[in-house]
Amino acid sequence: MAVRKPPITTREYWAPGHAACAGCGCATALRLATKALSEAMEEKYGDPNAFAIAHATGCMEVVSAVFPYTAWKAPWIHVAFENAAAVASGIEAAWKKLGRKGKILAIGGDGGTADIGLQALSGMLERWHNVLYLMYDNEAYMNTGIQRSSSTPYGAWTTTSPPGKYSVGEDKPKKWVALIAAAHQIPYVATASIGNPLDFVRKIKKAGKIDGPAFVQVLCTCPTGWRSPLEKGVEIARLAIETGIWPLFEIENGDIWNIKIQPPGGGAKVYKEGNRVVRIEFKKPIEEYLKLQGRFKHLFKRPEAIEELRNQVKAMWKVLGVEAILPRPEE
């Protein structure tokens, strides 16, 4: 009888018993990422443990390292909110001097990456350190009280962007750090989502094997900050892809004219010119994604705000070179 090989290693680097909220999508992302990176190191260097982690202050750092305990089964350093990329750069330089082979994994949330740590990230990428930077994007400063970040999407409720008579909630468009990273013309940039775990694992393995800097921005659901059912995290993350809210793409060597778009699924029709995706007709409206999250509840009393978000999503796809057709619920 044939034995089916599991899609990912059974080795664990993220132990149970951590203090993350029930249904935390970021915990799922870090568990998968470390397992995938372990596989990449085994395939490239013959050593599954050939990596070390520099982890910025944030949700996942706090819940995984409540002194004197730790959930990490790999070399791991807790660093300041803003300097995961800088510390990872130093570790990489030391390993190079010692002749030690492997990959350094830097981990930061959207606050510690898109805002506070953006300068350190840019420097790390520009200096061409052999570091994989993983941005786990739950779209707000969840650890410190659900404050908005520059990665918070338009219309979302946070404690610092509360909706009201004169406010729609967050009134700025989302910052796509992956595109900023790609502007450094580094070997590899990708977006991912826990709603498509196999795609995420593939991208982490690919990023891990590359010589030089790599950047992966993964969407992680947060039931606490998103006011969503804790058991629906993966479903919500998948709907983000299927409605067009969250694009899955890869950019290699800064070639923004040859962005590799992954099909969103969900019944969407994808049109290509050669190998390049030029048009996607989405079947599911963005309302299917929004309605499962309390942070967007107020938008259903403001149809003009939902329309503005729809236009922002179209504009984001246009930057990627894709015409996005986003349906409305009645269509």
Curated annotation (Swiss-Prot):
Binds 1 [4Fe-4S] cluster per subunit. Keywords: 4Fe-4S, Iron, Iron-sulfur, Metal-binding, Oxidoreductase. Its cofactor is [4Fe-4S] cluster. It catalyses: 2 oxidized [2Fe-2S]-[ferredoxin] + pyruvate + CoA = 2 reduced [2Fe-2S]-[ferredoxin] + acetyl-CoA + CO2 + H(+). It comes from the Archaea. Coiled coil: none annotated. The keyword Metal-binding applies. One of its GO terms (molecular function) is thiamine pyrophosphate binding. Its EC number is 1.2.7.1. [4Fe-4S] cluster binds at residues 21, 24, 59, 222. Pfam families: TPP_enzyme_C. InterPro entries: PorB-like, THDP-binding, TPP_enzyme_TPP-bd. Heterotetramer of one alpha, one beta, one delta and one gamma chain. This is Pyruvate synthase subunit PorB. The gene is porB.
